[in-house]
């Protein structure tokens, strides 16, 4: 599979720059060129509830090449209880462009942020307000957590098809990550080939704004590239890939017909990018004692209990340590190293 992936990857990179979302229940899609990696931002403000375009109003466009990859393992089922558990942060996306309204998927990962694909945000043509998000959507008549309007877009600085979207609060001054609990990200330390996974999102070949889950296994994993044997269609772009712990291990981007579907794997490089740009993103190991980033970890240099932390009262170099020869309160008044010694 490794050789085959390398062979097809350059082909698919080319298609990503010219292809993206679905714009109708029939899974039609938009073409758009890639944009730069700088954030697209508009003035932050509370937004009115976005207007929802229903299936009959969505304009069909030309079919995107490789948007639909239905494999022999076509184990897809509808999720009707969308507001509970790890399904709640899965989000239905609409992008209103000059050539039509297009649909995609995403996942809420912070108080005001979600993750999706670069090729999804490219459809905004530089106007973040064109992107609307409806977390936990049940169908085109039922959006239990309302809608949110994007205010800023930041694309992943690497090659992976990944983007961060920041949203304004809604009319009730609620943030998107307050109406749903943001997803937990996996540290992916134990992720490997043959593990069971699911991709959950809003495929365009199903009734508009209905959530579907597809089950399968990882077939390839290297760097930021992950492939799997489950089925998806246009509209699944930006869907989260969950492991068996319901942690996000990747963001789905598309696939190659009769071959595989793929995602941006959340490896160390991607994880660092996300942490740098999303202050409150939560990875599964963040609160573990052995996580070096955990402030409670005694090995964290910022932890006052770290013996190497100069602020640790037991640290010999701590000026407040009475055993420090430079401390005026050092009981050894005859210590020649103490400038205040008697």
UniProtKB/Swiss-Prot annotation:
Catalytic reaction annotation: Preferential cleavage: Glu-|-Xaa, Asp-|-Xaa
Signal peptide (from-to): 1-29
Cleavage (site feature) positions: 68-69
Region (13 X 3 AA repeats of P-[DN]-N): 289-330
SUPFAM superfamilies: Trypsin-like serine proteases
Disordered: region residues: 33-63, 283-342
Cellular component, GO, one term: extracellular region
Residues the record marks as active site: 119, 161, 237
Gene Ontology biological process terms in this record: proteolysis
Annotated Low complexity bias: 39-50, 286-342
Keywords, sorted A to Z: Hydrolase, Protease, Repeat, Secreted, Serine protease, Signal, Virulence, Zymogen
Major site of localization recorded for this protein: secreted
Gene Ontology molecular function: any one: serine-type endopeptidase activity
Propeptide: 30-68
EC code: 3.4.21.19
Class of the enzyme per the UniProt entry, highest EC level: hydrolase
Pfam short name (any one): Trypsin_2
Modification after translation: Proteolytically cleaved by aureolysin (aur). This cleavage leads to the activation of SspA.
Misc: The cascade of activation of extracellular proteases proceeds from the metalloprotease aureolysin (aur), through SspA to SspB.
Role according to the record: Preferentially cleaves peptide bonds on the carboxyl-terminal side of aspartate and glutamate. Along with other extracellular proteases it is involved in colonization and infection of human tissues. Required for proteolytic maturation of thiol protease SspB and inactivation of SspC, an inhibitor of SspB. It is the most important protease for degradation of fibronectin-binding protein (FnBP) and surface protein A, which are involved in adherence to host cells. May also protect bacteria against host defense mechanism by cleaving the immunoglobulin classes IgG, IgA and IgM.
Family affiliation: Belongs to the peptidase S1B family.
Protein name, entry field: Glutamyl endopeptidase
Organism: Staphylococcus aureus (strain Mu50 / ATCC 700699)
């Amino acid at each position: 599979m490794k050789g085959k992936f390398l062979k097809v990857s350059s082909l698919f990179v080319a298609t990503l720059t010219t292809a993206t979302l679905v714009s109708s229940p029939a899974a039609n899609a938009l073409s758009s060129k890639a944009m730069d990696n700088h954030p697209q931002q508009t003035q932050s403000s509370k937004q009115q509830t976005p207007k929802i375009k229903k299936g009959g109003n969505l304009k069909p466009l030309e079919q995107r090449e490789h948007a639909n990859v239905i494999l022999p393992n076509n184990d897809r089922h509808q999720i009707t209880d969308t507001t509970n558990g790890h399904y709640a942060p899965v989000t239905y996306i609409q992008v209103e462009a000059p050539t039509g309204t297009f649909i995609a998927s995403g996942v809420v990962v912070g108080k005001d942020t979600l993750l999706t694909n670069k090729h999804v945000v490219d459809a905004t043509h530089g106007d973040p307000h064109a992107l609307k998000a409806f977390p936990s959507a049940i169908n085109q008549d039922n959006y239990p957590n309302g809608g949110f309007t994007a205010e800023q877009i930041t694309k992943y600085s690497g090659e992976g098809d990944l983007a961060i979207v920041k949203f304004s609060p809604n009319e009730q001054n609620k943030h998107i990550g307050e109406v749903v609990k943001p997803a937990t990200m996996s540290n992916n330390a134990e992720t490997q080939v043959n593990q069971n996974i699911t991709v959950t999102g809003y495929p365009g070949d199903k009734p508009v704004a209905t959530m579907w889950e597809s089950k399968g296994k990882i077939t390839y994993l290297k760097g930021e590239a992950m492939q799997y044997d489950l089925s998806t269609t246009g509209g699944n772009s930006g869907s989260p890939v969950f492991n068996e712990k319901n942690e996000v291990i990747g963001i789905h981007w598309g696939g190659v017909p009769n071959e595989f579907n793929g995602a941006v794997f959340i490896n160390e490089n991607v994880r660092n990018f996300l942490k740098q740009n999303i202050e409150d993103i939560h990875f599964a190991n963040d609160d573990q004692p052995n996580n070096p980033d955990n402030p409670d970890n005694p090995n964290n240099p910022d932890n006052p209990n770290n013996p190497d932390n100069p602020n640790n009262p037991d640290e010999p170099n701590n000026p407040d340590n009475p055993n420090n020869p430079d401390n005026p309160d050092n009981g050894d008044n005859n210590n020649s190293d103490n400038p205040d010694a008697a």
